[in-house]
């Protein structure tokens, strides 16, 4: 890169996490190390200054080097591969935006509008998406460990093969969402709406689904070992070949559930409604106790 007749070069050193900026002309050379995060944030802020027609960089870059895009309109914007780690995007409009491969780790996206957004393979680890609207969003193979999605709207979202370990999805709307082969180990889904959701072959060990609504959900071959499903509504759900070993299903509604060839060994079914369930070939070893089976 040439600026005012000087050749400017940038070198990233992984083990120091620094960027060296070197400026050369015909007579001398100067170099300086910069923290890589501040470097990338500054460059990203310059890009957004042009995109948003902002005159002063300080309007979108804080003194601490954090990108502040709170409440901005970035709908239908191509942000593929953008570096937005720890950025403030709360209340922003990102509907239909392309955020694939973007780094949004630690970002604040609380109450943001992400309807129809494309977030495939983005990094959203430790991000705050509480109350965000992700209706019909594409989160295929997205990294979302420890993310806060409490109260978020993920209806009809594509979360196939997404990584949501230890995520907070309490009271989230996941109705009709596709979570096939996603990893939700140790996640909190208490009170979540998962009606008609696809959880085929999904990893849900130790997950908290207490009080969740899973009516008509597809849980075939799902791994729910040691999951808490107390007071959950599983009516008309498909649990064929699911692993529910050591799961807590106390007071759950299992009316018309298909448990063919499922593993319920050592599961707790105290007070559960088991009316019209299919237990053909089901492993009930150590299950305790049965109740509410009246016809």
Curated annotation (Swiss-Prot):
Pfam families: Pentapeptide. The keyword Repeat applies. Residues 67-106, 107-146, 162-201, 207-246, 247-286 form the Pentapeptide repeat domain. Gene3D superfamilies: E3 ubiquitin-protein ligase SopA (2.160.20.80), Secreted effector protein pipB2 (3.30.2450.10). Keywords: Plasmid, Repeat. The keyword S-adenosyl-L-methionine does not apply. This is Uncharacterized protein in mobD 3'region. It comes from Pantoea stewartii subsp. stewartii.
